[in-house]
C-alpha cells in the first residue's frame, strides 16, 4: 500500500510511485543479497530501499533520488517526502505524468491537474521528463536534470489519456478531453 514510509539510519522518508519498473526483480535481489528485508512485493518498496541506500553516500535526499534513478528502469513518477522537503521525479522518457500545484504557501505534486482543482490549488507547471524537483520552505522549487541520461525522444503512455486520466485533466499541457 502507498504511501510507503521507511525509517532508516539517516531518518525517515515517505514515497508514493505511479508506474512500473522493468528491472524491479533484479534490483530487489541485489538489495536482498546485501541484507534488505522487504515487507511487501511492490515496486515502491524497491525504489524506497534504493533511495535510502543511496542516501548513505549522498549529501541530500534529492541527490539520492537522482542516483537511484540511474538504476531504476521503467515508466514512473515519484513523490518522496523527507521531514523538510517534498521531492518529485519523473522517468527520463516522461512516460508517467507529474505536475506541481500551489495554494497559498503550500505546494502539491500530482499525476493529474484535476487533483489540484479538487484541493483548490493552482497549476504551476509539469515536471519535465528526467527532472527532479525539490520543494522546501527555504528555497521554494528547485530543479535538477543533470543526473539522468536523456533519451533522444520522450514517450507517452496512450493509456494515460484513454483509460487512466480524467477528461478534465491536462498532461504535459495537453487537454485529456481534447485527445479523446
What are these regions (language model features)?
Residues 1-129, 134-180:
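Conserved short alpha-helical segments that host acidic/polar catalytic motifs at enzyme active sites
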Amino acid at each position: 500500500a502507498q504511501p510507503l514510509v521507511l525509517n532508516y539510519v539517516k531518518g525517515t522518508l515517505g514515497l508514493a510511485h505511479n508506474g512500473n519498473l522493468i528491472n524491479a526483480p533484479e534490483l530487489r535481489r541485489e538489495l536482498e543479497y546485501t541484507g534488505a528485508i522487504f515487507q511487501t512485493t511492490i515496486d515502491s518498496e524497491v525504489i524506497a530501499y534504493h533511495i535510502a541506500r543511496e542516501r548513505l553516500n549522498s549529501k541530500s535526499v534529492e541527490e539520492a533520488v537522482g542516483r537511484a534513478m540511474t538504476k531504476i528502469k521503467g515508466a514512473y513518477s515519484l513523490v518522496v517526502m523527507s521531514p523538510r522537503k517534498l521531492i518529485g521525479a519523473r522517468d527520463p522518457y516522461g512516460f508517467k505524468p507529474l505536475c506541481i500545484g500551489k495554494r497559498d504557501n503550500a505546494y502539491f505534486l500530482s499525476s493529474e491537474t484535476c487533483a489540484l482543482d479538487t484541493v483548490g490549488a493552482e497549476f504551476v507547471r509539469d515536471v519535465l521528463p528526467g527532472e527532479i524537483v525539490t520543494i522546501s520552505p527555504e528555497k521554494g522549487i528547485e530543479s535538477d536534470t543533470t543526473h539522468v541520461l536523456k533519451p533522444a525522444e520522450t514517450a507517452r503512455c496512450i493509456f494515460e489519456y484513454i483509460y487512466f486520466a480524467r477528461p478534465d485533466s491536462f498532461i504535459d499541457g495537453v487537454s485529456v478531453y481534447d485527445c479523446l
